[in-house]
Amino acid sequence: MPHLHESELFHAIKNPAFRRIGLMGRARTRSVTQSIGQIAQIINDMNLTLIMDVQTANLPTLNLTEIERVKIVKRSLIGEICDLVIVVGGDGSILHAAEALARYRVPVLGVNRGRLGFLADVKPDEAAFKLRQVLMGNYQLDHRFLLTMEIREGRKIIHEDMALNDVVLHAGKSVHMIDFQMKIDGHDVYRQHSDGLIVATPTGSTAYALSGGGPIIHPSMDAICLVPMHPHTLSSRPIVVSGTSEICIRIHEDNRTQPMVSADGKPSTPLDQEQRLYIRKHPDKLTLLHPPGFDFYEACRTKLHWNVHAEEFSLDVDDDIMDDE
């Protein structure tokens, strides 16, 4: 990172790329609230307009008394009136914010206070420098598609939701497998006995689907991944289909448990035998903003520890042993 005097980080920027900056976060830990306060002060010191949603502004221990230019609005409005939205937390915080922001195509910058941080890729101690780079126009945009899910009974839509990562069919609290059938674009694919099915976007391929044995899919690909959860047949494997595909799932009449459906880990909804679950690409996309130098493969290496090896032992005979002989 180039060396800048601390005071230079907070100077106002002439003709910044973004002027109305939203700030969102969920206070799972004190560090999240602390970072939100620090970023709010940075934005204020740069003479930019800070916009916060009501939930974030009312977080416990968050003190905004020294912030001169702050507007507090409903969360549903923040994407409409902001040029850029900063989300503080982990990837879950960005998943939570995606529903409110995607339809406005407003760029989202994630500051990581979680664990992996595939979506929130800015470290808290780099926030001032990275934000300054972004405001000077040095950034790259990354458009991620979402999924829409509908539970239908006949022509009636019983429940609908959207997901950035995945839609998951699961057995809820039951220990029984689910018996279900799946079609893709009207074609029969299989009847399966398993603990469920993960339907993931490329973004979600590094989340729950990865732990289920699914492939990592580059976020630029137009594809959907179907990952069976503990299938009862060894031949059941993940399937990657076109991003334009429509997946239809029905519960077989021999099923013995109550299947549930969840989008991005939100509260689950039951799927009954007379209903159908439809999953396809959502018309909106979430626009992620990355500071200069973002590299998906580097993120994989770092966050999945691809380059971490056990201590390597030389195959050569130890010189000390040779000397002793």
Swiss-Prot record:
E.C. numbers: 2.7.1.23
Keyword tags: ATP-binding, Cytoplasm, Kinase, NAD, NADP, Nucleotide-binding, Transferase
Residues reported in the UniProt entry to bind NAD(+): D91, G92, H96, N165, D166, H176, H193, D195, T206, A207, Y208, A209, L210, S211
Keyword Transferase in annotation: yes
Gene3D superfamilies according to UniProt: Probable inorganic polyphosphate/atp-NAD kinase, domain 1, Probable inorganic polyphosphate/atp-NAD kinase, domain 2
Keyword Kinase in annotation: yes
GO cellular component: cytoplasm
Matches recorded under InterPro entries: ATP-NAD_kinase_N, ATP-NAD_kinase_PpnK-typ_C, NAD/diacylglycerol_kinase_sf, NADK
Domain of life of the source: Bacteria
Catalysis performed (reactions): NAD(+) + ATP = ADP + NADP(+) + H(+)
Co-factor(s): a divalent metal cation
GO biological process: NAD metabolic process; NADP biosynthetic process
Active site: D91
A GO MF term: NAD binding
NCBIfam families noted in UniProt: PRK01231.1
Family: Belongs to the NAD kinase family.
Function field: Involved in the regulation of the intracellular balance of NAD and NADP, and is a key enzyme in the biosynthesis of NADP. Catalyzes specifically the phosphorylation on 2'-hydroxyl of the adenosine moiety of NAD to yield NADP.
Protein name in UniProt: NAD kinase
Lineage: Bacteria, Pseudomonadati, Pseudomonadota, Gammaproteobacteria, Moraxellales
